[in-house]
Amino acid sequence: MSYLETTHNVYKEAALTPDVGLCCTTNPIWELPGLKIPRIMQEMNYGCGSTVHARDLTNNPKMLYVGVGGGMELLQFSYFNRQKAGVIGLDVVDEMLEASRKNFIEAEEINPWFKSNFVDLRKGDAMNLPVDDNSIDVAAQNCLFNIFKSD
């Protein structure tokens, strides 16, 4: 099995059966007024933090995030762009995209300001981004640069 296949399978399994110990932390990066993070999103936080600072997220930036995990970062980014498809989440693992979709339903229930359609989930990878040129203001990733090799 190739490196990319192995990585895909690890994240597929993590989407189907959340693995709290898979990565560095389950704590939200930011604590913002009126933002509540569903427990399942915290359990599925397979990142090590954010490469984005909240002060850089002004004027409704169109955002792209690669490696959706349980959707926690996407929810946090949506706090700053409360528009339909204001945040694009990209992942190669179908099961992770589906888990995030489900988690956004829970996020809507506990965050009156949040709508699932603020996040546009897309299948794809960082080497071939399924977005138009010059359409993104802020881009970030979920600690995945180690798997961006062709094989």
Predicted regions and their residues:
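N-terminal auxiliary segments of SAM/dcSAM-dependent transferases
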Residues: M1-N27
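Conserved alpha-helix/loop element of class I SAM-dependent methyltransferases that forms part
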Residues: C24-K62, E73-F80
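Class I SAM-dependent methyltransferase SAM/SAH-binding core
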Residues: N59-N128
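A short acidic, Gly/Pro-enriched loop at the edge of an enzyme's catalytic core
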Residues: M127-A139
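Active-site micro-motifs of SAM-dependent methyltransferase domains
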Residues: N128, F145-N146
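A short beta-strand submotif of the Rossmann-like class I SAM-dependent methyltransferase core
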Residues: A140-L144
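A short, conserved alpha-helix within the catalytic core of class I
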Residues: I147-D151
